[in-house]
Amino acid sequence: MTRELLLGALLIVASFGTALLSAVAGFGGGVLLLPVFVAVFGPRDAVAVLTVAQLASNGSRVWFNRHEVDRRLVRIFAAGAVPAAVAGALLLTSAPLQALTRVIGLFLLAMVVWRRVRPNTARVGDRGFAALGAASGFGSALVGSVGPMVAPFFLARGMVRGAYIGTEAASAVVMHLTKLVVFGAAAVLTWRTGLIGLALAPAAASGAWTGKKVLDRLPVNVFVILVEAGLIISGLLLLLTGG
């Protein structure tokens, strides 16, 4: 019992801390929790727990910005995202654990590289956005969250503030719901993992709120370095050890 309480406290602190860091640094989000979840739950359950937590987080963002959501763009994104998320989720349920762990490690390293070298993102048309949805749905099913890589394409459509936040979050909700249906059918998502993911959502929301409060008081570069260092170290460990 004591061990479970300590583990729960660790996960709450990790959720709060990573949300705070990502809110100040401007990127990272749920991705920062991946190595923590992998260490605690293993790679397969880690993606399921992160998916539940991300669904709760994105769902609240959709609600707060519901009047500004571009529903047409969400439908276009979903046309590619839903079938691809099903395919990715099915692959996750059967993928060897060591291989899956290394895929997550590569993804964490790719996050840092993408941030450093990404080109200016051109505006893509409707077909391109459906293709983006497919790539996002498949990738999200394997690693839990690809938001930081997808966000520039929403911004390139001229979206700002509530329209951007709500539309990007609504697109993520579609992917997460699709994945959870498959995870539930394949017994990857259990009551235990689902409740853990939901329980961590308030801690992440509190961390994000705190991060916004301290954003103007602390040097952002310090937080960016910390986030990137954490992603690199975690990615290398997962890649080299396979869990």
For the regions a protein language model found, what residue spans apply to each?
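Transmembrane helix-loop junction
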Residues: 39, 93, 156-157, 216, ...
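Interfacial loop-to-transmembrane junctions
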Residues: 208-231
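Transmembrane helix exit motif
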Residues: 58-66, 89, 94, 103-127, ...
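Membrane-interface helix termini and inter-helical loops of multi-pass transporters
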Residues: 89-98, 183-195, 240-243
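Small-residue-rich hydrophobic segments that form or flank transmembrane alpha-helices
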Residues: 8-76, 133-137, 147-201, 208
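Loop-to-transmembrane alpha-helix entry segments
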Residues: 71-76, 94-108, 126, 193, ...
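Small-residue-rich segments of transmembrane alpha-helices in multi-pass membrane proteins
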Residues: 35, 39-44, 78-89, 111, ...
